[in-house]
Amino acid sequence: MGIQLKNINKSFNNVEIYKDFTLNLPGNEISCILGPSGCGKTSLLNMIGGIIHQDSGSIEGLEDKIISFIFQEPRLLPWKTVKANLEFVLKDVNLRKKDEIVERNLKIVGLQDFSRFYPGQLSGGMKQRVAIARAFCYPSNLILMDEPLKTLDPKLKWGLMKTFLNLWREDQRSVIFVTHDVDEALVLGEEIFVFSRPPVKVKKRYTNPLNEEEKDMTNMEFFRQKNKIMDHLD
């Protein structure tokens, strides 16, 4: 089941960010929210995640949702090892099953040899891979991603996108991914929603036509689809 936002209103300091805003997000897909910085993308995630509340309107489809987050910064516990950071979200799982889940996810993100390392011993990209693995260890059915690739260089970003897709294919869940980067949207998003500046409207809903081979920034079809989306961006 998807998520429906109906007639959402939200203001900050008397500035209307959302006014009678309605949006339907599909279930069990990667939905990408694409728009300029400051347009309210993070606020949307925070409303869905229950971190903040809308002034009025309703959000439906969350009744059965268990949510995990992937933030811009990894937010790992520095006094715990990589393995212990993942185990931390598996408190109610027996030891054998816990080890199995942690080992599987660390292997998919390519960090099986770093399980005893501490966050301070890892690079920024490695920390974010741990954060992604942790989100998939947690028994959630909805993952909210708030620009987790924003501060990374292009090579690291590309590797992390592939890492995320590998995990998602192994364990498909509903994902809402926020970004201002068209390349990220085309690589990760199945449905792409282009937001305007506030008060927010959906300028374009775009079903991603690219296959796996075409999800390459050097591919001509990728370049063509990127230009189509950019025509709708503020």
Where do the protein language model's features map onto the residues?
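Catalytic Walker B motif of ABC-type/P-loop ATPase nucleotide-binding domains
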Residues: 143-147
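Conserved signature/switch motifs of ABC ATPase nucleotide-binding domains
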Residues: 117-120, 138
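Hydrophobic anchor residue at the start of the ABC signature
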Residues: 132
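Helix-to-loop junction immediately C-terminal to a conserved catalytic motif
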Residues: 49
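The feature captures the beta-strand-to-loop junction immediately N-terminal to the Walker
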Residues: 34-36
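ABC-type ATPase nucleotide-binding domains, specifically the catalytic core motifs of the NBD
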Residues: 53, 84-99, 108-109
